[in-house]
Amino acid sequence: MVTSSSGIKETTDRLRGLTRKELLEAAWREWGNYKGKKIQEYFDTEADPRGNRWHDLSPYTWARKKSSKILTETGALRKSIRFEPKGGVVFIKSDIAYARTHNFGSAVKHIPQREFVGFTEEDRKMAEEIFRRVLRESFSAGSFAVRENR
């Protein structure tokens, strides 16, 4: 085995400078970019994160609607979704008042759930992959090298 210690001090100094929060926020920011694209796909396909089609609109709603797509009248809802990594977690937000009602549904208002924000097994795996890569890249940023001769 050949081990080079060149750059170990620089690498460890750099890693000491990175806080847990910074690493988590970097990973969550990347995951937010991934999930943002997935959410746009849900609006395009009119399906929830597990691939189930959204409930159709009522005939009354279709009659007064200007768009031929569910949850897309002006596009404001789909454009409003944003991700905010903060304190080691990520918040998925929208300033649109009716976003929560459509995502979770409302028995009182007789609006069925049309989920566009949800966490799937695929999302979990992607988060794990991103977190591993962010850590791996953080540790390999210096010139420390380990090579095995076989």
Predicted regions and their residues:
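Short, Lys/Arg-rich flexible segments
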Residues: 1-150
